[in-house]
A protein has these predicted regions:
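Beta-strand->loop->alpha-helix junctions that form or flank phosphate-binding loops
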Residues: 97-104, 108, 134-135, 240-243, ...
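Conserved ATP/PPi-binding loop(s) of AMP-dependent carboxylate-activating enzymes
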Residues: 135-140, 151-181, 219
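Active-site glycine-centered loops adjacent to acidic/histidine catalytic or metal-binding residues
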Residues: 77, 101, 134, 192, ...
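AMP-binding/adenylate-forming catalytic core of the ANL superfamily
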Residues: 38, 46, 165, 170-171, ...
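Glycine-centered tight turns that cap/initiate beta-strands
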Residues: 61, 69, 93, 139, ...
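Conserved AMP-binding/adenylation subdomain of ANL enzymes
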Residues: 6-45, 59
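Gly/Ser/Thr-rich phosphate-binding loop
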Residues: 18-21, 43-48, 57-128, 141-142, ...
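Acidic/polar alpha-helix N-cap and adjacent early helical turns
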Residues: 306-315
């Protein structure tokens, strides 16, 4: 287990113990250590955020072995790029699965199984499902998409993911204002923007608070990050909006370079323009040694915005 056991990964660890299995606990997200355990300790279940999956796939030794014991490679914390799911299955086999969850929900909200993921990869008619995070689990009573006015939206329309059920938290300790904010209209508001398709599969666009408004357009950083992650020079990345007189917010990429990689800002911006068009492509890209992260490994975009607004030289 790489993730801290204070949240969802703790439930994963308990399930392993109930089944009579062994949990391999790691003090940090050490890529060399993860590879060592995968290649030597008959690991059957691996739980990683998408960013660590990306780093694993770029490691020069990850393709030196087969992984016949691995049954589940579970990702959570952020959507994972469809191209990386396909690449991961080529390396690890048909083991990729994904959940959408948050601590306030108590239990996983959605799940897509390895079988569903493999079927989506093999069938062009289902390939779009590689971009989803599954269907609602039985542990959540109800899941819907809501607009700003409390109206529930039909399939295909984007809005905030809202939840109901007995596992949902009653509120934030000693913070009635924050509790009221997330419990508007009788639903728990996840803070994630997404949509449901006709079959009930959930597709996440991005975190509501991370959306960039640039030149009058709503831009989701996740879409840009997934393009950046496909470039060989990028090890890790985050995209934020910084204050700009012309655009309101200027789309800005912050990257960690892959080992031995060189960086050409204009070439990387052009790479994004080819995939996304000029409006969504970053106006600038900054290199950093280490992206700021929380205790559970998530990039702290608020910190990035504050730092970049103070001047890129501070990164």
């Amino acid at each position: 287990c790489v993730a801290p056991i204070t949240h969802a990964s703790g439930l994963v660890c308990l399930g392993t113990l109930v089944a009579g299995g062994t949990n391999i606990m790691m003090a940090s997200a050490d890529i060399e250590g993860i590879i060592h355990h995968l290649q030597n300790d008959h690991v059957t279940n691996l739980f990683l955020p998408p960013t660590l999956v990306y780093v694993l796939l770029k490691h020069p030794r990850i393709r030196d072995s087969n992984y016949p014991d691995l049954r589940f490679l579970l990702t959570a914390g952020a959507p994972i790029a469809a191209e990386k799911i396909v690449e991961a299955m080529a390396v690890f086999g048909p083991v990729m699965c994904q959940v959408f969850a948050q601590s306030e929900a108590g239990m996983p909200v959605t799940f897509i199984s390895p079988g569903e993921t493999a079927a989506a990869s093999a069938d062009p008619a289902k390939r779009h499902l590689l971009q989803c995070c599954g269907k609602k689990t039985e542990m959540i009573e109800a899941m819907a998409i809501m607009d700003e006015n409390g109206k529930l939206l039909p399939a295909g329309e984007s809005g905030e993911v809202v939840l109901r059920g007995p596992t949902i938290m009653k509120g934030y300790l000693n913070d009635s204002k924050a509790t009221a904010e997330v419990q508007r209209f009788g639903w728990h508001h996840s803070g994630d923007i997404g949509y449901l398709d006709e079959e009930g599969y959930l597709f996440i666009n991005d975190r509501k608070r991370d959306m960039i408004i640039s030149g009058g357009f709503n831009i989701f950083p996740l879409e840009i990050e997934q393009v950046l992650f496909t470039h060989p020079c990028v090890q890790e990345c985050a995209v934020v909006g910084i204050v700009d007189d012309k655009w309101g917010e200027a789309v800005t990429g912050v990257i960690e370079l892959a080992p031995g990689a060189s960086f050409d800002e204009q070439e990387l911006i052009a790479f994004c323009k080819d995939a996304l068009g000029s409006m969504k492509a970053p106006k600038s890209i900054v290199v950093t040694d280490n992206l700021p992260r929380s205790a559970v490994g998530k990039v702290l975009k608020r910190n990035l915005r504050e730092t970049l607004n103070a001047g890129p030289a501070r990164i």
